[in-house]
């Protein structure tokens, strides 16, 4: 057990502690010679488009953590609005978090699961001469995908449609092209067939994270943030 090993090496762990509320940053600065901030990026990227305030649209982590607690043995019930059972689920985002949402939705008994990705579909095999030493760009299919999911690439979500609850999404097919400076830019495709509407009862936003949560820890530590809110 890695934690037990670290304890034997002299590391002490204090769980369920929120810096700025349970312990002040001033106390840490006074009691310790050095402080390492390893909080990660916790603020999820939002999709602020018309209809975002409809019910049934959630950040991926709010959906996944509830299931994780059940898997750990916690006796809790998932609220109906967070359950994928018998629902048409749409996952926006093509990364690992999106893959976790697919697997969890299938296990909860989703009626259908569709994953949307704004980027182009990657090649089946990477071009090692072009990608090395960077992370290779190639199509990745997880065990969650193999369990069942529709995967759509090069689409941008433009509207969440519905009355009180989300009922469908309006999508626009997009194209990636190089501009005069040689940078890849995104443009909406034209024509009637470029716009698509998909049914949705539950939408999970899995588009990555933008920066640390700007709580009392960040403020009291006095660290500088850039224009995007990153350390």
Task: Give the ranges of each region predicted by the language model.
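Active-site rim loops that border cofactor/substrate pockets in soluble metabolic enzymes
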Residues: 139, 145, 169-191
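FAD-site-proximal beta/loop scaffold in flavoenzymes
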Residues: 53-86, 178-231
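Phosphate-coordination loops involved in phosphoryl transfer and adenosine-cofactor binding
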Residues: 16, 85-88, 154
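Rossmann-like NAD(P)H-binding beta-loop-alpha module
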Residues: 74-110
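Rossmann-like dinucleotide-binding cores of NAD(P)H-dependent redox enzymes
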Residues: 1-4, 13, 102-159
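Short gly/pro/ser/thr-enriched loop/turn and capping motifs at secondary-structure boundaries
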Residues: 43-45, 64-66, 121-125
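Feature captures the FAD/FMN-dependent oxidoreductase FAD-binding
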Residues: 3-50, 158-180, 200-204, 209-217
